[in-house]
Amino acid sequence: MYSLKHLLNFVFSFIIILLSSQSFSETISFKGLVLSDFWIKKVIANNNTTSGHIRIENKNEKNERLISVESDFSKITELHDMKIKNDIMIMKHIEEGVLIKSKSQLNLMPGSSHIMFIDLTKSLKKIKNQKVKFNFEKAGSIVINMPIINKTEKSNKKKKHRHH
């Protein structure tokens, strides 16, 4: 038989595990939207730009639009579309925002549309997280503390790269 002390230790440990998994789950539910897999790419060398990535699922009955993204660590924060033309990667600001259809998912990931942080106002090299504000047409705004991660992009590193 287990004593009350053993039972309380088990319950306490179980609660701690649940709370820990919540904080590292990288999933946030917000007004019918599920935000997951969010991260900021670690800055390489003396680069003054970086990218942000997120998966947004719209569980609502109506379409939603991600209008804009804001940060306090870059002078410009934009939603970008990326296309390859004649072996050259071309990125363009998506001024009208991005539509997230009802019951569908938006993936802002490496090698596709993404968030661009341009002209960084502080070094992110020794920082583990940064707050980023997402502005939606219907749901309003939410601030997410996004981890800064050294992930390798899947894109071909030999491709040329230019903005606009």
Predicted features by range, described:
Residues 26-164:
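Compact, glycine-rich, soluble single-domain proteins
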Residues 20-22:
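N-terminal signal peptide c-region/cleavage motif recognized by signal peptidases
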Residues 2-11:
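Bacterial N-terminal signal peptides that target proteins for export
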